[in-house]
Amino acid sequence: MIGLFDIQTEIDKDKLEYIKENWQGAEYCEQCYAKHSRQMPYSYKDLIYKDKDEIVEIAHAATYYIYLNRDMATGNTEIDDGALVALLNRDINFAFDESTKTLTKQGQGLGFLNAFIKEKLLSVTVANKGPRTVTDRMQDMKYLYKVVRKAMAMKTDLTITRLFSTAKIVDGQSVSNFRPMASAYLMHKYGIWANPDKDVLNFWIPSEGWLGRLLSSYYTAYKNPDKQINYISTDPSGDVVSSFWEVVEYLSNFGGIHKVKNWSADIRQHGSDVPEADFYKNEGKKFELIWTSPPYSLGFEKYKDSYIIKAIDESGNGVEITDSKGNYLSEELVLDCGKKVKRLRSGDDFTYNGHKYRLVSKRNLGQSHSKASSNYGWNEVFFRPTVKNAKSNLADGGTMIWNVCDVRTHQTLEADVVRICQEEGFTLKDTLKYELSRVPGGILQADGTRKSLRELKKPFEPVFIFNL
Protein backbone atom coordinates (compact mmCIF):
# COMPACT_ATOMS: atom_id res chain seq x y z
CA MET A 1 0.00 0.00 0.00
CA ILE A 2 1.34 3.42 -1.00
CA GLY A 3 0.73 6.13 1.59
CA LEU A 4 -0.46 9.64 0.79
CA PHE A 5 3.04 11.11 0.94
CA ASP A 6 4.98 8.07 -0.25
CA ILE A 7 6.77 8.26 -3.59
CA GLN A 8 6.01 5.27 -5.79
CA THR A 9 9.10 3.97 -7.59
CA GLU A 10 7.83 0.91 -9.45
CA ILE A 11 4.81 -0.52 -11.22
CA ASP A 12 2.43 -2.32 -8.86
CA LYS A 13 2.61 -6.10 -8.94
CA ASP A 14 -1.15 -6.34 -9.58
CA LYS A 15 -0.74 -4.21 -12.72
CA LEU A 16 1.93 -6.55 -14.03
CA GLU A 17 -0.40 -9.48 -13.41
CA TYR A 18 -3.18 -7.60 -15.19
CA ILE A 19 -0.92 -7.13 -18.22
CA LYS A 20 -0.15 -10.86 -18.18
CA GLU A 21 -3.84 -11.79 -18.17
CA ASN A 22 -4.97 -9.35 -20.87
CA TRP A 23 -3.26 -10.21 -24.14
CA GLN A 24 -5.70 -8.96 -26.80
CA GLY A 25 -4.03 -10.12 -30.01
CA ALA A 26 -1.95 -8.72 -32.85
CA GLU A 27 -4.68 -6.49 -34.30
CA TYR A 28 -5.14 -4.74 -30.95
CA CYS A 29 -1.36 -4.17 -30.80
CA GLU A 30 -1.53 -2.25 -34.07
CA GLN A 31 -4.51 -0.20 -32.84
CA CYS A 32 -2.75 0.72 -29.59
CA TYR A 33 0.42 1.65 -31.44
CA ALA A 34 -1.54 4.07 -33.63
CA LYS A 35 -2.84 5.69 -30.43
CA HIS A 36 0.48 5.82 -28.54
CA SER A 37 3.10 6.07 -31.29
CA ARG A 38 3.81 9.75 -30.65
CA GLN A 39 4.77 8.93 -27.05
CA MET A 40 6.97 5.94 -27.94
CA PRO A 41 9.33 4.95 -26.51
CA TYR A 42 7.99 5.23 -22.97
CA SER A 43 10.43 5.56 -20.09
CA TYR A 44 9.84 3.39 -17.05
CA LYS A 45 9.04 6.36 -14.82
CA ASP A 46 6.25 7.36 -17.25
CA LEU A 47 4.52 4.03 -16.60
CA ILE A 48 4.48 3.94 -12.81
CA TYR A 49 1.29 5.97 -12.29
CA LYS A 50 -0.65 4.75 -15.33
CA ASP A 51 -3.91 2.97 -14.52
CA LYS A 52 -4.10 -0.71 -15.34
CA ASP A 53 -6.14 -0.34 -18.54
CA GLU A 54 -3.83 2.31 -19.98
CA ILE A 55 -0.73 0.32 -19.10
CA VAL A 56 -2.19 -2.68 -20.94
CA GLU A 57 -2.68 -0.43 -23.97
CA ILE A 58 0.92 0.72 -23.73
CA ALA A 59 2.14 -2.88 -23.45
CA HIS A 60 0.31 -3.74 -26.67
CA ALA A 61 1.62 -0.58 -28.36
CA ALA A 62 5.19 -1.40 -27.32
CA THR A 63 4.71 -4.91 -28.68
CA TYR A 64 3.90 -3.54 -32.11
CA TYR A 65 6.74 -1.03 -31.75
CA ILE A 66 9.32 -3.77 -31.30
CA TYR A 67 7.68 -5.86 -34.05
CA LEU A 68 7.99 -2.96 -36.51
CA ASN A 69 11.66 -2.54 -35.64
CA ARG A 70 12.56 -6.24 -35.37
CA ASP A 71 15.03 -6.04 -38.26
CA MET A 72 17.14 -3.69 -36.14
CA ALA A 73 17.89 -6.56 -33.74
CA THR A 74 21.01 -7.47 -35.69
CA GLY A 75 22.41 -3.98 -35.12
CA ASN A 76 24.71 -2.20 -37.54
CA THR A 77 25.70 -4.49 -40.42
CA GLU A 78 28.27 -2.07 -41.85
CA ILE A 79 31.88 -2.89 -41.01
CA ASP A 80 33.10 -0.44 -38.39
CA ASP A 81 36.78 0.28 -39.03
CA GLY A 82 36.69 2.83 -36.22
CA ALA A 83 35.83 0.11 -33.72
CA LEU A 84 38.76 -1.97 -35.01
CA VAL A 85 41.19 0.95 -34.71
CA ALA A 86 39.88 1.73 -31.21
CA LEU A 87 40.70 -1.86 -30.21
CA LEU A 88 44.19 -1.73 -31.69
CA ASN A 89 44.92 1.54 -29.88
CA ARG A 90 43.72 0.24 -26.50
CA ASP A 91 46.35 -0.48 -23.82
CA ILE A 92 46.31 -4.15 -22.81
CA ASN A 93 46.79 -3.28 -19.14
CA PHE A 94 43.27 -1.84 -18.95
CA ALA A 95 41.90 -5.36 -19.46
CA PHE A 96 43.00 -6.73 -16.08
CA ASP A 97 42.63 -5.59 -12.48
CA GLU A 98 45.62 -7.05 -10.67
CA SER A 99 44.23 -6.37 -7.19
CA THR A 100 41.11 -8.49 -7.76
CA LYS A 101 42.53 -10.79 -10.49
CA THR A 102 39.63 -9.78 -12.72
CA LEU A 103 39.40 -9.55 -16.52
CA THR A 104 37.43 -6.32 -16.70
CA LYS A 105 34.58 -5.22 -18.96
CA GLN A 106 36.40 -3.79 -21.99
CA GLY A 107 34.12 -4.03 -25.01
CA GLN A 108 36.49 -2.80 -27.72
CA GLY A 109 36.29 -4.84 -30.92
CA LEU A 110 32.78 -6.24 -30.49
CA GLY A 111 31.30 -3.50 -32.67
CA PHE A 112 33.67 -4.50 -35.47
CA LEU A 113 32.78 -8.19 -35.18
CA ASN A 114 29.03 -7.56 -35.12
CA ALA A 115 28.97 -6.77 -38.83
CA PHE A 116 30.21 -10.31 -39.54
CA ILE A 117 28.42 -12.37 -36.90
CA LYS A 118 25.38 -10.67 -35.32
CA GLU A 119 22.74 -12.08 -37.66
CA LYS A 120 24.16 -15.60 -37.47
CA LEU A 121 24.63 -15.37 -33.71
CA LEU A 122 20.96 -14.54 -33.16
CA SER A 123 20.01 -17.46 -35.41
CA VAL A 124 21.70 -20.05 -33.19
CA THR A 125 19.18 -22.30 -31.51
CA VAL A 126 19.60 -22.68 -27.77
CA ALA A 127 18.78 -26.36 -27.73
CA ASN A 128 17.74 -26.74 -24.10
CA LYS A 129 15.28 -23.83 -24.43
CA GLY A 130 13.33 -25.19 -27.38
CA PRO A 131 13.69 -25.14 -31.17
CA ARG A 132 13.10 -21.43 -31.82
CA THR A 133 15.93 -18.94 -32.13
CA VAL A 134 15.89 -15.30 -31.06
CA THR A 135 15.36 -14.38 -34.71
CA ASP A 136 12.38 -16.74 -34.99
CA ARG A 137 10.77 -15.38 -31.84
CA MET A 138 10.98 -11.79 -33.07
CA GLN A 139 8.22 -12.65 -35.58
CA ASP A 140 5.77 -13.69 -32.85
CA MET A 141 3.80 -10.77 -31.37
CA LYS A 142 2.46 -12.78 -28.45
CA TYR A 143 6.04 -13.55 -27.49
CA LEU A 144 6.99 -9.88 -27.93
CA TYR A 145 4.14 -8.92 -25.59
CA LYS A 146 5.77 -11.17 -23.00
CA VAL A 147 9.08 -9.38 -23.66
CA VAL A 148 7.44 -6.00 -22.99
CA ARG A 149 5.89 -7.28 -19.75
CA LYS A 150 9.27 -8.68 -18.69
CA ALA A 151 10.93 -5.34 -19.44
CA MET A 152 8.39 -3.57 -17.24
CA ALA A 153 9.00 -6.08 -14.44
CA MET A 154 12.73 -5.41 -14.76
CA LYS A 155 12.08 -1.66 -14.45
CA THR A 156 13.63 -0.74 -17.80
CA ASP A 157 12.65 1.87 -20.36
CA LEU A 158 10.73 0.57 -23.38
CA THR A 159 13.38 1.59 -25.89
CA ILE A 160 14.33 -0.64 -28.81
CA THR A 161 17.74 -1.34 -27.28
CA ARG A 162 16.28 -2.36 -23.91
CA LEU A 163 13.54 -4.44 -25.48
CA PHE A 164 16.00 -6.31 -27.71
CA SER A 165 18.22 -6.99 -24.70
CA THR A 166 15.23 -8.38 -22.82
CA ALA A 167 14.19 -10.53 -25.79
CA LYS A 168 17.46 -12.46 -25.50
CA ILE A 169 16.57 -13.78 -22.04
CA VAL A 170 12.81 -14.40 -22.29
CA ASP A 171 12.11 -18.12 -22.87
CA GLY A 172 15.65 -18.59 -24.07
CA GLN A 173 19.20 -17.33 -24.01
CA SER A 174 21.30 -16.01 -26.84
CA VAL A 175 24.91 -17.02 -27.25
CA SER A 176 27.44 -14.47 -26.03
CA ASN A 177 30.90 -13.58 -27.29
CA PHE A 178 34.08 -13.54 -25.23
CA ARG A 179 35.43 -9.99 -25.14
CA PRO A 180 38.54 -9.56 -27.36
CA MET A 181 40.45 -7.41 -24.84
CA ALA A 182 40.05 -10.02 -22.10
CA SER A 183 41.24 -12.74 -24.46
CA ALA A 184 44.15 -10.57 -25.61
CA TYR A 185 45.28 -10.17 -22.01
CA LEU A 186 45.39 -13.96 -21.61
CA MET A 187 47.40 -14.24 -24.83
CA HIS A 188 49.86 -11.65 -23.56
CA LYS A 189 50.25 -12.99 -20.04
CA TYR A 190 50.41 -16.70 -20.89
CA GLY A 191 51.73 -16.44 -24.45
CA ILE A 192 53.91 -13.38 -25.06
CA TRP A 193 55.15 -12.58 -21.53
CA ALA A 194 55.57 -16.23 -20.54
CA ASN A 195 57.80 -16.93 -23.57
CA PRO A 196 60.16 -13.93 -23.95
CA ASP A 197 62.78 -15.96 -25.83
CA LYS A 198 60.43 -17.36 -28.48
CA ASP A 199 59.98 -15.51 -31.76
CA VAL A 200 57.13 -17.76 -32.95
CA LEU A 201 54.09 -18.47 -30.76
CA ASN A 202 51.32 -20.92 -31.59
CA PHE A 203 47.83 -20.68 -30.07
CA TRP A 204 45.09 -23.32 -30.30
CA ILE A 205 41.48 -22.41 -29.53
CA PRO A 206 39.55 -25.71 -29.15
CA SER A 207 36.10 -24.04 -29.42
CA GLU A 208 36.27 -20.97 -31.65
CA GLY A 209 32.85 -19.55 -30.87
CA TRP A 210 32.06 -16.14 -32.31
CA LEU A 211 35.54 -14.89 -33.17
CA GLY A 212 36.38 -12.79 -30.13
CA ARG A 213 39.57 -14.79 -29.63
CA LEU A 214 40.43 -14.59 -33.33
CA LEU A 215 40.33 -10.80 -33.14
CA SER A 216 42.38 -10.84 -29.94
CA SER A 217 45.12 -12.81 -31.70
CA TYR A 218 45.25 -10.11 -34.39
CA TYR A 219 45.51 -7.46 -31.65
CA THR A 220 48.29 -9.46 -29.97
CA ALA A 221 50.26 -9.66 -33.22
CA TYR A 222 49.76 -5.93 -33.83
CA LYS A 223 51.06 -5.04 -30.36
CA ASN A 224 54.05 -7.40 -30.69
CA PRO A 225 55.48 -6.99 -34.22
CA ASP A 226 58.65 -8.89 -33.24
CA LYS A 227 56.61 -12.07 -32.58
CA GLN A 228 55.00 -14.32 -35.19
CA ILE A 229 51.52 -15.28 -33.96
CA ASN A 230 50.06 -18.46 -35.49
CA TYR A 231 46.43 -19.02 -34.52
CA ILE A 232 44.56 -22.29 -35.10
CA SER A 233 41.05 -23.04 -33.91
CA THR A 234 38.46 -25.77 -34.28
CA ASP A 235 34.68 -25.56 -34.49
CA PRO A 236 32.08 -27.83 -36.13
CA SER A 237 29.72 -24.94 -36.99
CA GLY A 238 29.61 -24.03 -40.66
CA ASP A 239 28.35 -20.55 -39.75
CA VAL A 240 31.32 -19.96 -37.47
CA VAL A 241 33.77 -21.24 -40.08
CA SER A 242 32.38 -19.05 -42.87
CA SER A 243 32.39 -15.97 -40.62
CA PHE A 244 35.94 -16.82 -39.51
CA TRP A 245 37.26 -16.66 -43.06
CA GLU A 246 35.36 -13.44 -43.78
CA VAL A 247 37.04 -11.76 -40.81
CA VAL A 248 40.47 -13.20 -41.66
CA GLU A 249 40.20 -11.94 -45.24
CA TYR A 250 39.19 -8.48 -44.06
CA LEU A 251 41.93 -8.24 -41.44
CA SER A 252 44.57 -9.52 -43.86
CA ASN A 253 43.74 -6.65 -46.21
CA PHE A 254 43.43 -4.00 -43.50
CA GLY A 255 46.27 -1.59 -44.22
CA GLY A 256 47.94 1.68 -43.43
CA ILE A 257 49.69 2.14 -40.12
CA HIS A 258 47.68 -0.75 -38.69
CA LYS A 259 48.96 -3.34 -41.18
CA VAL A 260 49.79 -6.63 -39.45
CA LYS A 261 52.28 -8.92 -41.19
CA ASN A 262 53.23 -11.25 -38.32
CA TRP A 263 49.91 -13.09 -38.00
CA SER A 264 48.37 -16.21 -39.50
CA ALA A 265 44.99 -17.78 -38.78
CA ASP A 266 43.42 -21.12 -39.62
CA ILE A 267 40.30 -23.01 -38.57
CA ARG A 268 39.41 -26.69 -38.87
CA GLN A 269 35.75 -27.63 -39.17
CA HIS A 270 35.53 -30.31 -36.52
CA GLY A 271 35.29 -30.52 -32.76
CA SER A 272 38.11 -30.39 -30.25
CA ASP A 273 37.20 -33.85 -28.98
CA VAL A 274 37.94 -35.82 -32.16
CA PRO A 275 41.20 -37.52 -33.24
CA GLU A 276 41.71 -34.87 -35.94
CA ALA A 277 42.26 -32.31 -33.15
CA ASP A 278 45.43 -34.07 -31.97
CA PHE A 279 47.62 -31.72 -33.99
CA TYR A 280 50.88 -33.04 -32.57
CA LYS A 281 50.11 -36.62 -33.59
CA ASN A 282 48.71 -35.66 -37.00
CA GLU A 283 50.85 -32.67 -37.98
CA GLY A 284 53.66 -32.37 -35.45
CA LYS A 285 52.29 -29.06 -34.11
CA LYS A 286 52.77 -27.86 -30.53
CA PHE A 287 51.13 -24.83 -28.89
CA GLU A 288 52.39 -22.44 -26.24
CA LEU A 289 48.82 -21.52 -25.31
CA ILE A 290 45.62 -23.55 -25.49
CA TRP A 291 42.50 -21.89 -24.22
CA THR A 292 38.77 -22.04 -24.73
CA SER A 293 35.35 -21.10 -23.42
CA PRO A 294 33.12 -23.95 -24.64
CA PRO A 295 29.33 -24.32 -24.45
CA TYR A 296 28.65 -24.56 -20.73
CA SER A 297 26.08 -27.32 -20.74
CA LEU A 298 24.75 -30.28 -22.63
CA GLY A 299 22.56 -28.95 -25.42
CA PHE A 300 23.30 -25.27 -24.81
CA GLU A 301 24.09 -24.42 -28.42
CA LYS A 302 22.66 -26.09 -31.50
CA TYR A 303 24.11 -24.90 -34.79
CA LYS A 304 23.16 -25.93 -38.28
CA ASP A 305 24.78 -29.31 -38.85
CA SER A 306 27.43 -29.83 -41.51
CA TYR A 307 28.25 -33.05 -43.32
CA ILE A 308 31.31 -34.85 -44.63
CA ILE A 309 30.08 -35.98 -48.05
CA LYS A 310 31.84 -38.69 -50.03
CA ALA A 311 30.69 -39.20 -53.61
CA ILE A 312 31.64 -40.53 -57.04
CA ASP A 313 32.15 -37.98 -59.82
CA GLU A 314 31.32 -38.40 -63.52
CA SER A 315 34.71 -40.04 -64.16
CA GLY A 316 34.11 -42.65 -61.47
CA ASN A 317 36.59 -41.13 -59.03
CA GLY A 318 35.87 -41.03 -55.31
CA VAL A 319 35.80 -37.45 -54.00
CA GLU A 320 35.02 -35.55 -50.82
CA ILE A 321 32.68 -32.60 -51.43
CA THR A 322 33.53 -29.23 -49.88
CA ASP A 323 32.88 -25.61 -50.81
CA SER A 324 35.43 -23.33 -52.50
CA LYS A 325 37.20 -22.71 -49.17
CA GLY A 326 37.37 -26.36 -48.17
CA ASN A 327 34.50 -26.17 -45.67
CA TYR A 328 32.02 -29.01 -45.29
CA LEU A 329 28.49 -28.39 -46.56
CA SER A 330 25.73 -27.09 -44.29
CA GLU A 331 22.56 -29.14 -43.90
CA GLU A 332 20.53 -26.20 -45.25
CA LEU A 333 22.59 -25.73 -48.43
CA VAL A 334 20.40 -26.10 -51.51
CA LEU A 335 22.26 -28.02 -54.21
CA ASP A 336 21.96 -27.30 -57.93
CA CYS A 337 19.41 -30.10 -58.20
CA GLY A 338 17.12 -28.27 -55.75
CA LYS A 339 17.59 -30.70 -52.88
CA LYS A 340 19.02 -29.69 -49.50
CA VAL A 341 22.13 -31.46 -48.25
CA LYS A 342 20.28 -32.89 -45.25
CA ARG A 343 17.83 -34.65 -47.64
CA LEU A 344 20.51 -36.55 -49.57
CA ARG A 345 20.46 -40.32 -49.26
CA SER A 346 23.06 -42.92 -50.23
CA GLY A 347 22.89 -43.56 -53.98
CA ASP A 348 21.25 -40.20 -54.79
CA ASP A 349 22.48 -38.35 -57.85
CA PHE A 350 23.04 -34.63 -57.29
CA THR A 351 24.70 -31.62 -58.87
CA TYR A 352 26.91 -29.15 -57.03
CA ASN A 353 28.75 -26.20 -58.59
CA GLY A 354 27.90 -27.53 -62.04
CA HIS A 355 29.38 -31.00 -61.46
CA LYS A 356 27.40 -34.25 -61.22
CA TYR A 357 27.94 -36.73 -58.39
CA ARG A 358 26.46 -39.86 -56.85
CA LEU A 359 26.39 -39.94 -53.05
CA VAL A 360 28.36 -42.75 -51.41
CA SER A 361 28.14 -41.65 -47.78
CA LYS A 362 27.17 -38.65 -45.68
CA ARG A 363 28.49 -38.27 -42.13
CA ASN A 364 27.22 -35.63 -39.75
CA LEU A 365 30.13 -33.76 -38.19
CA GLY A 366 28.10 -33.78 -35.01
CA GLN A 367 28.06 -31.57 -31.96
CA SER A 368 28.70 -32.56 -28.40
CA HIS A 369 25.10 -31.98 -27.35
CA SER A 370 23.92 -34.72 -29.71
CA LYS A 371 26.47 -37.31 -28.60
CA ALA A 372 25.44 -37.89 -25.01
CA SER A 373 22.30 -37.81 -22.91
CA SER A 374 23.68 -36.59 -19.58
CA ASN A 375 26.17 -34.14 -18.15
CA TYR A 376 28.33 -37.07 -17.09
CA GLY A 377 28.25 -38.35 -20.65
CA TRP A 378 29.08 -34.92 -22.04
CA ASN A 379 32.01 -34.62 -19.65
CA GLU A 380 33.39 -37.90 -20.92
CA VAL A 381 32.46 -37.46 -24.60
CA PHE A 382 33.58 -33.85 -24.94
CA PHE A 383 35.67 -32.56 -22.03
CA ARG A 384 37.98 -35.48 -21.42
CA PRO A 385 38.87 -36.14 -25.10
CA THR A 386 39.51 -32.42 -25.55
CA VAL A 387 41.81 -32.36 -22.52
CA LYS A 388 43.63 -35.44 -23.83
CA ASN A 389 44.18 -33.67 -27.16
CA ALA A 390 45.35 -30.56 -25.32
CA LYS A 391 47.86 -32.61 -23.35
CA SER A 392 49.28 -34.00 -26.58
CA ASN A 393 49.31 -30.57 -28.25
CA LEU A 394 50.74 -28.44 -25.42
CA ALA A 395 54.35 -27.31 -25.77
CA ASP A 396 56.78 -27.74 -22.87
CA GLY A 397 56.05 -25.00 -20.34
CA GLY A 398 52.79 -24.12 -22.10
CA THR A 399 49.48 -23.14 -20.53
CA MET A 400 45.93 -24.46 -20.93
CA ILE A 401 43.01 -22.21 -19.94
CA TRP A 402 39.33 -23.04 -19.46
CA ASN A 403 36.59 -20.45 -18.90
CA VAL A 404 33.47 -22.25 -17.69
CA CYS A 405 30.74 -21.58 -15.16
CA ASP A 406 28.18 -23.65 -13.27
CA VAL A 407 24.74 -23.31 -14.86
CA ARG A 408 21.28 -24.56 -14.01
CA THR A 409 21.55 -27.54 -16.35
CA HIS A 410 25.10 -28.47 -15.30
CA GLN A 411 25.57 -27.37 -11.71
CA THR A 412 28.91 -29.11 -11.20
CA LEU A 413 30.58 -27.94 -14.41
CA GLU A 414 33.40 -26.00 -12.74
CA ALA A 415 34.30 -28.88 -10.42
CA ASP A 416 34.00 -31.40 -13.27
CA VAL A 417 36.41 -29.45 -15.48
CA VAL A 418 39.01 -29.07 -12.73
CA ARG A 419 38.68 -32.74 -11.76
CA ILE A 420 39.03 -34.03 -15.32
CA CYS A 421 42.03 -31.81 -16.05
CA GLN A 422 43.76 -32.99 -12.89
CA GLU A 423 42.96 -36.62 -13.66
CA GLU A 424 44.64 -36.16 -17.06
CA GLY A 425 47.83 -34.83 -15.47
CA PHE A 426 47.30 -31.05 -15.38
CA THR A 427 47.89 -28.85 -12.33
CA LEU A 428 45.60 -25.93 -11.50
CA LYS A 429 48.00 -22.98 -11.15
CA ASP A 430 45.63 -20.05 -10.79
CA THR A 431 42.02 -18.91 -11.10
CA LEU A 432 41.12 -15.52 -12.59
CA LYS A 433 37.73 -13.83 -12.75
CA TYR A 434 35.94 -12.81 -15.94
CA GLU A 435 33.64 -9.87 -15.21
CA LEU A 436 30.18 -10.35 -16.68
CA SER A 437 28.01 -7.83 -18.48
CA ARG A 438 24.66 -7.18 -16.88
CA VAL A 439 21.12 -6.77 -18.11
CA PRO A 440 19.73 -3.66 -16.36
CA GLY A 441 16.73 -3.85 -14.05
CA GLY A 442 15.52 -6.31 -11.45
CA ILE A 443 13.76 -9.66 -11.30
CA LEU A 444 10.32 -9.84 -9.66
CA GLN A 445 10.29 -12.28 -6.72
CA ALA A 446 7.36 -14.32 -5.43
CA ASP A 447 6.92 -11.99 -2.44
CA GLY A 448 6.56 -8.96 -4.71
CA THR A 449 10.06 -7.58 -4.12
CA ARG A 450 12.70 -7.25 -6.82
CA LYS A 451 16.30 -8.35 -6.80
CA SER A 452 18.93 -7.19 -9.23
CA LEU A 453 20.61 -9.74 -11.47
CA ARG A 454 23.84 -9.00 -9.63
CA GLU A 455 22.20 -10.16 -6.39
CA LEU A 456 20.87 -13.32 -8.00
CA LYS A 457 24.04 -14.41 -9.76
CA LYS A 458 27.70 -13.82 -9.09
CA PRO A 459 29.07 -11.03 -11.31
CA PHE A 460 31.93 -13.05 -12.75
CA GLU A 461 32.93 -16.45 -14.15
CA PRO A 462 36.09 -18.37 -13.24
CA VAL A 463 38.99 -18.69 -15.67
CA PHE A 464 41.07 -21.74 -14.74
CA ILE A 465 44.80 -21.69 -15.54
CA PHE A 466 46.46 -25.11 -15.94
CA ASN A 467 50.00 -26.35 -16.59
CA LEU A 468 51.42 -29.83 -17.01
Regions found by a protein language model. Give the residues of each.
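Class I S-adenosyl-L-methionine-dependent methyltransferase catalytic core
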Residues: 1-83, 89-468
